[in-house]
Amino acid sequence: MALKVEAKGGKVGIQWDDGSDYHDVTKIYVRGGLEGIQFIKFEYVKAGKKVIGPIHGASGRGFTETFEINNLEKEYLLSIEGYYNASTGVIQCLQFITNKKTYDPIGYNEGARFTLSASRSKIIGFHGFADKYLNSLGAYFIKIPSIQSAIEGAKTTGKGFDDGGDYDGIRKVYVTTDGSAIRHVRFDYDKAGQVETRERGAKTGTQHEFTVNHPYEYITSVEGTYAHTQPYNCVVLTSLTFKTSKGRASPAIGKVTGSKFKLERQGDAIVGFHGRVGSCIDGIGVYYAPLPPSPPPPEKLQGQGGDGGDSWDDGAFKNVKKIYVGQGDVGIAAVKFEYETYTSEVILAERHGKETLLGYEEFELDYPSEYITAVEGCHDKVIGSETGVITMLRFKTNKRNSPPFGLESAFSFILEKDGHKIVGFHGKASTLLHQIGVHVTAIA
């Protein structure tokens, strides 16, 4: 069954839906004008035959571009990036990304940015809203099957293992070696944002770790060696090296001796492992899936408040889990935040400001289904401070609003970006919180 991804843009005009019973998208017609994208039209492939879809929108003065996707050469549409005007609800720009090419954008890079994508999936259909212009665009996705490689090393000794290839990526690799053989492997896979762990072998020796910054980084290559090794009296893996889409490589883990091998497929990521295991890891193979486009990096929004104190920046994370706000006599005295990293570790960042005898009030999110979309607040000059101080904070999520922490004052502000969630904080602080800003990333 196809996955229907919500349309991005304005939900105004006539709702349309081309459906999801196609095999591929083969041609896209887009007409742009001064006010945005006027219309869009698709050609699909179904049971080997071309199906021409209707026009969505209207034709005015402008320019039309055609994007051809060569499905006969196994090219398929992975994702779409674009911008829409939050006031008018009109799509302003579209860019199409396939497994073989990133096409030039059509339109103007203005407004709220959006992405239509799904992990390890291709687009087979579209839906949205339109009237005189294309107001919103959504898509249907189906999973792209992974491809299993042959096993390198021993192919008959030990027992077979197979983690499968239905994961979105790999977050962390653990390899244990005793100096002559690879004894144990463990893989932390990502599946729909959750970690699933698989491990094989005997954990005897020294364990080495290699962390991948998923979803911004993927393992793309595994190199290694294997040899007939004593005292095991059989062929076993003697070393492993992992390389990523960012050009990083782990050190060679183990003893580089014997026959060399390399598991790599152009344009693909490694999303799973299989092989043979006995007292050691005797052989290893992988599952390949198309390397997805990297999500846009987090964006840092300018802080609001006064200019006093020292600058601080927690950075950007996968999500915010918990917020602590400490109040003082004249304003917010301190804040600290609990985050989840992309490797599923929970960290409590440093305190910003000075803790008072009043302690902290807490706001805990229903993670992972709940996330922060905006921060509202107030700032003002107060007695004892030459520059502005944050006097009130309130956090808005996709489900609810927090109570206000502190008191409203002269100057109010809001930190948010349409279509984005808050994944980190920065600001300025002394014995009080003078300024606060946020890091945001597009909501998947």
From Swiss-Prot:
The modification N-acetylalanine is found at residue 2. It comes from the Eukaryota. One of its GO terms (molecular function) is carbohydrate binding. Residues 2-143, 146-290, 298-442 form the Jacalin-type lectin domain. PROSITE patterns: JACALIN_LECTIN. Keywords: Acetylation, Lectin, Repeat. Gene3D superfamilies: Jacalin-like lectin domain (2.100.10.30). Belongs to the jacalin lectin family. This is Jacalin-related lectin 11. It comes from Arabidopsis thaliana.
